[in-house]
Each structure stands twice: as structure tokens, then as C-alpha cells.
A protein has these predicted regions:
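Low-complexity, glycine/serine/proline-rich disordered segments
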Residues: 1-75, 80-83, 88, 114-120, ...
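Interface elements of modular peptide-recognition networks comprising either
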Residues: 106-109, 136
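Repetitive, compositionally biased segments used for assembly/scaffolding
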Residues: 94, 100-101, 108-113, 122, ...
């Protein structure tokens, strides 16, 4: 004799009754209001200034600035540590990838790489180096 549905395990991992699956539809463009007040996006879809084959954002503390930029641009993405352990990777549902590396081939210049997969993004694929204001790189 069955007691019927009690709801005791509703919402738990094994529950199939009334389960809901949230679908992540976040895009990198959703984060522009968080990013652009401090890091303006130009009309071509780039952050920072033009550098040698990269974009450049200058600050008094490049590591902290790169972390702040990265944290503002990645909400809604799936995070993972890079296989080599030298950075983190954020992947959005549309396949857009943002990578943050503290150590790069340019000394004291952390980097954020943005690889856009959406055709209608306001942001262009780019690599941004964060450099210290007032150095020979400035």
C-alpha cells in the first residue's frame, strides 16, 4: 500500500518531482554596466589604449587592477583554473572565454585575454596588458 507523495525529499539531489533546471544565458555584454564606468569601452569594442599588438590599461597597481577588471567582466561564466596553474579561465554559455594571467612574458604586466564567440557582442576579442603608470612602458 502506497502512502503517496509526501514531498519529504523535494528539492534534493534525488528528487524528480517539481524539479527545475536553471539555464544560464549570461553573456559578457551583460557585464558591461559593471565594467565600463571604470574601464571605458571605445566605439570599436576595445578596452584601454592601443599598445604593441595588445591593449594597455595603466594603473598604480597592475595586479589589483587586472583582478578588478576580471572580476567585473566574468559574472555568469563558469570558472576553472588553467591546466598549467598559471591563471583562471571563465567560459560563458555562448563559448566566449576570458583568461586572467598574473604572470606573463612581459614582466610585472598581468594580462586578460578576451575571446568573443558571439557575432553581436559590443566587445571585440582582445588581449589587455596591465602596466604600472610612470614606468618605461608608460
Amino acid at each position: 500500500m502506497s502512502k503517496g507523495y509526501s514531498g519529504l525529499f523535494n528539492g534534493t539531489k534525488g528528487s524528480n518531482h517539481n524539479s527545475q533546471t536553471a539555464i544560464n544565458t549570461a553573456t559578457i555584454d551583460d557585464n558591461l554596466p559593471l565594467v565600463t564606468p571604470k574601464y571605458p569601452l571605445n566605439s570599436y569594442g576595445n578596452f584601454g589604449e592601443k599598445g604593441k599588438n595588445v591593449r594597455v590599461i595603466k594603473s598604480t597597481n597592475p595586479i589589483a587592477t587586472s583582478q578588478d577588471f576580471y572580476n567585473k567582466i566574468i559574472p555568469g561564466a563558469k570558472l576553472e583554473i588553467l591546466a598549467n596553474g598559471k591563471g583562471t579561465k571563465a567560459t560563458f554559455p555562448d563559448g566566449t572565454v576570458v583568461v586572467h594571467r598574473i604572470t606573463t612574458s612581459t614582466p610585472n604586466s598581468p594580462a586578460v585575454s578576451i575571446n568573443i564567440k558571439s557575432n553581436n557582442s559590443k566587445i571585440k576579442s582582445q588581449k589587455i596588458h596591465f602596466i604600472k603608470k610612470g614606468t618605461h612602458n608608460d
